Amino acid sequence: MTRKALAAGLADLGIDLPDEAQQKLLAFRDLLLKWNKTYNLTALRDPAQAISHHLLDSLAILPHVGSGNLLDVGSGGGLPGIPLAIARPELSVSMVDTVQKKTTFLQQAVIELALRNVTVHHARVEEMQGQYAQISSRAFAEIGLFISLTRHLLAPNGRWLAMKGVRPDDELKALPADIAVEAIIPLTVPGLDAERHLIILKAGS
């Protein structure tokens, strides 16, 4: 039933993944729930809910993820970074979190799932270096703070991908004048009865 629920959800999202990737997604779900008993990585305990609220919710943004390297900020339990990395093995994904128990879990997940395209950083994002074509966040911070903490890491012509619940109009109105909202995309996540939006932003010249 679990496998069927995942396959049906992916079909609803218009995402076609090979069996191996689907098996890895479920293995990640199992690993997350196993470690959650000790590390408190997520409030969810139900395996079926974890498919909709974690796996499918993360993958709902997949059609809007480009080919350039991606930094996932405040990755926590690896969402959306690990599902994206499983679905797109050619995509270079870096994940950063300040909480050591979370990055310990992420490093173990990378090893157990053999994710060669993922790098884990235990650090404060404002102290990181490098350049990323895409910077994502899910339940990390208010959009203005997310941008100010990561702006030095955004490559020229790069994009921020901010995952939000209800449309964050107040946050968008408060953005600096040189930040452009490229798109506000309502997301429909199978099995998730809640508003979801992807906000895509760019830095002005």
From Swiss-Prot:
Give the EC number. 2.1.1.170
Q: Which enzyme type, at the first EC level?
A: transferase
Q: Which Pfam families match?
A: GidB
Per its record, the protein catalyses: guanosine(527) in 16S rRNA + S-adenosyl-L-methionine = N(7)-methylguanosine(527) in 16S rRNA + S-adenosyl-L-homocysteine
CC per GO annotation: cytosol
Its domain of life reads Bacteria
Q: What is its main location?
A: cytoplasm
Alphabetized Gene3D superfamilies for the sequence: Vaccinia Virus protein VP39
Q: Cellular location of this protein? A: Cytoplasm
List each coiled-coil range: none
> Could you say which residues bind S-adenosyl-L-methionine here?
74, 79, 125-126, 138
Q: Which UniProt keywords apply?
A: Cytoplasm, Methyltransferase, rRNA processing, S-adenosyl-L-methionine, Transferase
- Free-text function comment from the UniProt entry: Specifically methylates the N7 position of guanine in position 527 of 16S rRNA.
**Database matches in PANTHER family:** S-ADENOSYL-L-METHIONINE-DEPENDENT METHYLTRANSFERASES SUPERFAMILY PROTEIN
Family, per the entry? Belongs to the methyltransferase superfamily. RNA methyltransferase RsmG family.
Q: What is this protein called?
A: Ribosomal RNA small subunit methyltransferase G
Origin species, per record, is Dechloromonas aromatica (strain RCB)
Upper taxonomic classification of the species? Bacteria, Pseudomonadati, Pseudomonadota, Betaproteobacteria, Rhodocyclales
Gene for this protein? rsmG
